[in-house]
């Protein structure tokens, strides 16, 4: 849907918080999808801090745990041409924390679907909030 970036994201979608960074038109069609995400609509995305040991998505059961992970999370490592923070190319198992207006949630990448012959590329997540 609009807020996950798995459907062609409208960058002005009112409820969207995660944006697919699209394609690199300088590359051939079968390898041009960036598979990167950025925040939209005043949301902020962070990665799980590299200092966290023994992390287990399934073991997270309370919102205060998610807020702590967000507060201690790392900024996204890249910047797009608009100056927005952008992830690396995502991979299965990557973990992100999202905060928009105090609504904080945890997402883990469960699948990255790259399609070379159409524009149906997608990133699928599990979510906890």
What residue ranges belong to the model's regions?
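Short, solvent-exposed secondary-structure boundary/capping segments
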Residues: 113-129
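N-terminal "domain-start" segment
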Residues: 1-84
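Context-gated lysine
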Residues: 19, 34, 103, 126-128
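Acidic, glycine-rich flexible loop segments
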Residues: 59-115
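Generic structural motif
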Residues: 25, 45, 105-107, 125
């Amino acid at each position: 849907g609009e807020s996950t970036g798995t459907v062609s994201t409208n960058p002005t979608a009112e409820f969207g918080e995660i944006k697919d960074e699209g394609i690199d038109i300088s590359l051939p069609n079968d390898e041009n999808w960036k598979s990167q995400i950025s925040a939209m609509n005043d949301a902020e995305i962070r990665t799980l801090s590299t200092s966290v040991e023994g992390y287990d998505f399934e073991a997270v059961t309370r919102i205060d745990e998610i807020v702590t992970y967000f507060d201690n999370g790392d900024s996204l490592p890249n910047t797009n041409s608009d100056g927005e923070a952008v992830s690396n190319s995502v991979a299965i198992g990557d973990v992100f924390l999202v905060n928009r207006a105090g609504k904080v949630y945890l997402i883990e990448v469960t699948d990255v679907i790259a399609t070379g012959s159409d524009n149906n590329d997608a990133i699928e997540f599990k979510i906890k909030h």
